[in-house]
């Protein structure tokens, strides 16, 4: 370290210490701040709580302190919400005040500092992006237009598993085939494109880049440099890799999908409105000057992550729980056989006639919530919450997993028991009508993908259970359902091998 850098570092440490001491002295005077561990100069609470701020660790902190707690990470304030009443305040009652988004140093790179829809600040740009994305993605018309494609993709999964001789004996990692299915479902909607197999070179390249993006973004290992600016130089290599991955992904989206669709559109003498795919609507908005080239690519970026990955995680969790709870799997199969008739493959219109299947989906989303802390919220200005002062630009984490797994709010929440949604919790829906259960959030910044995710989950899990007896591999009574958490993700740690024995109809 040269002398100039050393001087700058020491000066930064001194100023940070003075700032931290000054702020800590403000606690309880002009500001009534939420409770939490006492911060130390420069590092705040980072030395006490570390980098791994997953839903379970934050639950433990809430039990120690309060349903609203404040963590100071040097320059960042993290407010953790752990009660339905406070969640309602953040997401609904004060939805405008807390409707913005905070980003960290890595998400700044992957979203172009909020040029997407998920991580943009609340305001005119967000409203414009939401409007542009709603028509091609998030309406019942889209569901009805594409449901036959979803059913076809699910049927292809069933056929491929039946053809795989290993599936019924030693088992297969079915997630790999389901991943192809999810890409085909969403790329049909986005680009009217699909991949023929898991070996398709473009699919392999796309999957690898998306996987690397997720690994880099969801890791906790860069938190120290995000929380503590004086440590940020140590992230230089990490952030360089993030930028390289971001550039390669956006170039791939542009070269192989967006530009290809532009060429296709320009060669058509007459354009059939009924055949428009999502990117056509988005490119129309670009031509009108509503969004720019970068916005188009960041919308594609969001769909690759927010739609494909989260739904895939939930499908994988649902299958794992059914493998480990054979009595529930059998009960679900019996319902479909009774209501639809043996051999009649479940379709999107059938889902409303299958309450136990719906309950299985709800219970999967409750116990194994894909986004357990929701996407972080932020207040642009000083605000009040639960009788406390919340400083401007605080990162608000709603621990939705704990709201749905708190034994004070749910009967035996640690159990996978779909019956709860047919009995004591029969009124609870996934759309946020009960603030104990928020798998998609609620309010202005809720996940609009709920309208796609629920039928895709129902069709996929329904067809697998209809056509196969899903079992652990030989020598195991259950499969491993250990969790792997991320910045705000929750997926299964090990992609387990599943035995799929075809049923005879």
Swiss-Prot record:
Compartments in which it is found: Membrane
Molecular function terms, GO-annotated: heme binding; iron ion binding; trans-cinnamate 4-monooxygenase activity
Keyword Lyase set for record: no
Main location: membrane
Transmembrane segments: 3-23
Any Pfam family: p450
Induction of expression: By wounding.
UniProt keyword Iron present: yes
CDD domains: CYP73
Cofactor list: heme
Domain of life of the organism encoding this protein: Eukaryota
Pathway it works in: Phenylpropanoid metabolism; trans-4-coumarate biosynthesis; trans-4-coumarate from trans-cinnamate: step 1/1
GO terms classed as biological process: lignin metabolic process
Keyword list, A-Z: Heme, Iron, Membrane, Metal-binding, Monooxygenase, Oxidoreductase, Transmembrane, Transmembrane helix
Membrane topology per record: Single-pass membrane protein
Binding site for heme: 447
GO cellular component: a single term: membrane
Catalytic activity: (E)-cinnamate + reduced [NADPH--hemoprotein reductase] + O2 = (E)-4-coumarate + oxidized [NADPH--hemoprotein reductase] + H2O + H(+)
Annotated EC: 1.14.14.91
Protein residues bound to (E)-cinnamate: 213-218, 306
The family this protein is said to belong to: Belongs to the cytochrome P450 family.
PANTHER family listed in its UniProt record: TRANS-CINNAMATE 4-MONOOXYGENASE (PTHR47948:SF4)
Its biological purpose: Catalyzes the first oxidative step of the phenylpropanoid pathway in higher plants by transforming trans-cinnamate into p-coumarate. The compounds formed by this pathway are essential components for lignification, pollination, and defense against ultraviolet light, predators and pathogens.
Protein name as it appears in the record: Trans-cinnamate 4-monooxygenase
């Amino acid at each position: 370290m040269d002398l100039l850098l050393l001087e700058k570092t020491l000066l930064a440490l001194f100023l940070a210490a003075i700032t931290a001491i000054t702020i800590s002295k403000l606690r309880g005077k002009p500001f009534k701040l939420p409770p939490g561990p006492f911060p130390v100069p420069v590092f705040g609470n980072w030395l006490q709580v570390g980098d791994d701020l997953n839903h379970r660790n934050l639950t433990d902190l809430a039990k120690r302190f309060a349903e609203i707690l404040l963590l100071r990470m040097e320059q960042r304030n993290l407010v953790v919400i752990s009660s339905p009443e406070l969640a309602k305040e953040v997401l609904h009652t004060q939805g405008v005040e807390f409707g913005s988004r905070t980003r960290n140093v890595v998400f700044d790179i992957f979203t172009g500092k909020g040029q997407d829809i998920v991580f943009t600040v609340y305001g005119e740009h967000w409203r414009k992006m939401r409007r542009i994305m709603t028509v091609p993605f998030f309406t019942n018309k889209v569901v009805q237009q594409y449901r036959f494609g979803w059913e076809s993709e699910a049927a292809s999964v069933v056929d491929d598993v039946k053809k795989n001789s290993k599936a019924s004996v030693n088992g297969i990692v079915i997630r790999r085939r389901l991943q192809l299915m999810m890409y085909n479902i969403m790329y049909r909607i986005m680009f009217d494109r699909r991949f023929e197999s898991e070996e398709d070179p473009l699919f392999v390249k796309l999957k690898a880049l998306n996987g690397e993006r997720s690994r880099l973004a969801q890791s906790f290992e860069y938190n120290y440099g995000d929380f503590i600016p004086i440590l940020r130089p140590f992230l230089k290599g990490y952030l360089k890799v993030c930028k390289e991955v971001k550039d390669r992904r956006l170039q791939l989206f542009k070269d192989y999908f967006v530009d290809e669709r532009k060429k296709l559109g320009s060669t058509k003498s007459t354009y059939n409105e009924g055949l428009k795919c999502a990117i056509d609507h988005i490119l129309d908005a670009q031509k009108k000057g509503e969004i720019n080239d970068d916005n188009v690519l960041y919308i594609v970026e969001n769909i690759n992550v927010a739609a494909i990955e989260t739904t895939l995680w939930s499908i994988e969790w649902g299958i794992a729980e059914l493998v480990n709870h054979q009595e529930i799997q059998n009960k679900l199969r019996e319902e479909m056989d009774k209501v639809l008739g043996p051999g009649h493959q479940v379709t999107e219109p059938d889902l409303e006639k299958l309450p136990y299947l719906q309950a299985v989906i709800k219970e999967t989303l409750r116990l194994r919530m894909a986004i357990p802390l929701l996407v972080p919220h932020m207040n642009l200005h000083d605000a009040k919450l639960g009788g406390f002062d919340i400083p401007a630009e605080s990162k608000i984490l709603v621990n939705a997993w704990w709201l749905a797994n708190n034994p004070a709010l749910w009967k035996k929440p640690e159990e996978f028991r779909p019956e709860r949604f047919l009995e004591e919790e029969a009124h609870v829906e996934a759309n946020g009508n009960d603030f104990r259960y928020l798998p998609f959030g609620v309010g202005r910044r809720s996940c609009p993908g709920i309208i796609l995710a629920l039928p895709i989950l129902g069709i996929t899990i329904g067809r697998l259970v209809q056509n196969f007896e899903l079992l652990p591999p030989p020598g195991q009574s259950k499969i491993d359902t250990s969790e792997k958490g991320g910045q705000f993700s929750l997926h299964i740690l090990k992609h387990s091998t599943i035995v799929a024995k075809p049923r005879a109809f």
